[in-house]
């Protein structure tokens, strides 16, 4: 059976933690749609186009990956892509509460969509895009936090 999943996020910017989740999801599914969100509620450091470009570069070596942007409800995007599985990453208990609420909200909007939660490997558990942005703001070195493929682009 052919299976595909959506891994949504703002990815501002993509981190090694995101890439860790993507690589592990590739072992579980035939296709992963990395859905870069155009979230008007978030003030992003990078434009939507740049975030899509960075994600494409970071995942170019992974054949199961398709990168797209979206600006709708996630469940609507999932329906459009005929996808019934959403992947989310959990770094800490603080992520769990928010992700659980979002998972239930998505389920209430479409009962056929399930959310799968993956934890990153321990060495990536502390990495977040907001940490990377904070370091970048002060011209710090983030090379150990982001995929090698995008270092020159930041």
Swiss-Prot record:
Instruction: Enumerate the subcellular locations listed in this protein's record, separating them with semicolons.
Output: Cytoplasm
Q: Which residues bind substrate?
A: 10, 42, 74, 88
- GO CC annotation: cytoplasm
What SUPFAM superfamilies does its record include? Nucleotidylyl transferase
- Which Pfam families does this entry report, sorted A to Z? CTP_transf_like
One GO BP: coenzyme A biosynthetic process
**Binding positions (ATP):** 10-11, 18, 89-91, 99, 124-130
Record site: Transition state stabilizer: 18
- Note the CDD domains from the entry: PPAT
Stretch forming the signal peptide: none
Cofactor(s) it depends on: Mg(2+)
Keywords, ordered alphabetically: ATP-binding, Coenzyme A biosynthesis, Cytoplasm, Magnesium, Nucleotide-binding, Nucleotidyltransferase, Transferase
How the protein assembles, per its UniProt entry?
A: Homohexamer.
The family assignment reads: Belongs to the bacterial CoaD family.
What is its biological role? Answer: Reversibly transfers an adenylyl group from ATP to 4'-phosphopantetheine, yielding dephospho-CoA (dPCoA) and pyrophosphate.
Q: What is this protein called?
A: Phosphopantetheine adenylyltransferase
Organism of provenance: Nautilia profundicola (strain ATCC BAA-1463 / DSM 18972 / AmH)
What gene name is listed for this protein? coaD
């Amino acid at each position: 059976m052919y299976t595909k999943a959506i891994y949504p996020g703002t990815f501002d910017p993509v981190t090694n933690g995101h890439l860790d989740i993507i690589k592990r999801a590739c072992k579980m599914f035939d296709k992963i749609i990395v859905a870069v969100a155009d979230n008007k509620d978030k003030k992003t450091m990078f434009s939507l186009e740049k975030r899509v470009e960075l994600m494409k570069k970071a995942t170019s070596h992974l054949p199961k990956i398709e990168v797209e942007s979206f600006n709708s409800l996630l469940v609507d995007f999932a329906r459009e892509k005929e996808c019934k599985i959403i992947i989310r990453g959990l770094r800490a208990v603080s992520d769990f509460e928010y992700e659980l609420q979002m998972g239930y909200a998505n389920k209430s909007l479409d009962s056929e969509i399930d959310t799968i939660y993956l934890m990153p490997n321990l060495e990536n558990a502390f990495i977040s895009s907001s940490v990377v942005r904070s370091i970048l703001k002060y011209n710090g070195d983030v090379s150990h936090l982001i995929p090698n493929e995008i270092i020159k682009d930041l």
